[in-house]
Amino acid sequence: MQSTTFTRLLAAAALGATTLFAPATQAQGAQQYVNINPPMPSDTPGKIEVLEFFAYTCPHCAAIEPMVEDWAKTAPQDVVLKQVPIAFNAGMKPLQQLYYTLQALERPDLHPKVFTAIHTERKRLFDKKAMGEWAASQGVDRAKFDSVFDSFSVQTQVQHASQLAEAAHIDGTPAFAVGGRYMTSPVLAGNDYAGALKVVDQLIVQSRK
């Protein structure tokens, strides 16, 4: 039986994140995107950045993750995908730290498994202790996990992620910023996950102009 307490914890952490992207700026008619104003500077000169704003507590992000993985495998050479974990409340910050900790420990393979742990296995990955225990069960050195989780580097990346979300006017997840100039989402693409990635492809072409 599903735990009522777990459900409440997940609902609290997901508040805002479970709502598909509702743009703060005006959509461009049938073009299925919004302009980001002012445009966002790139952290990767010479490349078109595609930023995926996500939250581990968001079921829509969990659903689209396999599609994003497949899309990234065939992305053009002048495109770089960066996944950006965001927090809509203080309780979600540890999940941002979890993402960057796994990246720092060179375990990006665990990224999709976090979604599975939370949404399928119903694990309570809401604090450092629970996250550390789960990571250890996946073969991660617990001492290294704890050290990196609270490191200055991870804290800096979390802060930068929050700044990116603010600059892109993120109201919900998942959402995609392309070339620092355009934003799309499954909602803008007609409530269609695959459709959102098709719009991303179109915006990449538009960003080259």
From Swiss-Prot:
It is found in: Periplasm. It comes from the Bacteria. One of its GO terms (cellular component) is periplasmic space. Residues 1-27 form the signal peptide. Disulfide bonds join C58-C61. Keywords: Disulfide bond, Periplasm, Redox-active center, Signal. Pfam families: DSBA (PF01323), Thioredoxin (PF00085). InterPro entries: DSBA-like_thioredoxin_dom (IPR001853), DsbA/DsbL (IPR023205), Thiol_disulfide_DsbA (IPR050824), Thioredoxin-like_sf (IPR036249), Thioredoxin_CS (IPR017937), Thioredoxin_domain (IPR013766). GO terms for molecular function: disulfide oxidoreductase activity. Involved in disulfide-bond formation. Acts by transferring its disulfide bond to other proteins. Required for periplasmic assembly of the pertussis toxin (PTX). Belongs to the thioredoxin family. DsbA subfamily. This is Thiol:disulfide interchange protein DsbA. It comes from Bordetella pertussis (strain Tohama I / ATCC BAA-589 / NCTC 13251). The gene is dsbA.
